[in-house]
């Protein structure tokens, strides 16, 4: 009986290896990076930006509070997103990547002890889309559970 099982296993292995030697194209084609986004941008955070994300907001952790309206700066360089809340004097750095098809992915904090959008219970990662027209960059949250990051990043940014 065990010899019969062995033979069946060997035959199954051979059958699995049968087929064309041609490589099938991948289901998705890789997109290229979007180096044209590199640079420094500015925008103003408004009351409307903050109110738009109130349904996501949880400021229950120590030292957490809503952002205040005011000037923001955004730097995009070599996989690093740097956002500065000028009025609060807070700078936050996160990994990011952008592709030519408009995907904008935000990864881990680079120095969470120096600044973070949300507390440790909120995922660090997020998915946005981007569009650029001339010197204007528009970011829009697709999936972001952090209200403060969404309030701050979603909107039109002017290149400086």
Indicate where each model-derived feature is located.
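Extracellular/mature segments of secreted proteins
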Residues: 26, 124-129, 152-159
């Amino acid at each position: 009986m065990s010899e019969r099982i062995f033979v069946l296993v060997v035959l199954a292995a051979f059958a699995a290896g049968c087929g064309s030697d041609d490589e099938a194209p991948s289901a998705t084609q890789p997109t290229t990076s979007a180096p044209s986004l590199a640079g420094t941008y500015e925008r103003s955070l408004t009351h409307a930006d903050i109110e738009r994300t109130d349904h996501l907001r949880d400021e229950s952790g120590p030292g957490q509070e809503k952002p205040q309206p005011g000037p923001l700066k955004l730097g995009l360089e070599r996989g690093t997103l740097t956002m500065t809340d000028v009025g609060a004097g807070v700078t936050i750095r996160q990994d990011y990547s952008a592709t030519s098809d408009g995907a904008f992915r935000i990864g881990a904090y680079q120095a969470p002890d120096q600044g973070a959008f949300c507390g440790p219970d909120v995922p660090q990662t997020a998915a946005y889309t981007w569009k650029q027209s001339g010197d204007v960059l528009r970011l829009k949250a697709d999936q972001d559970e952090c209200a403060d990051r969404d309030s701050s990043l979603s909107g039109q940014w002017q290149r400086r």
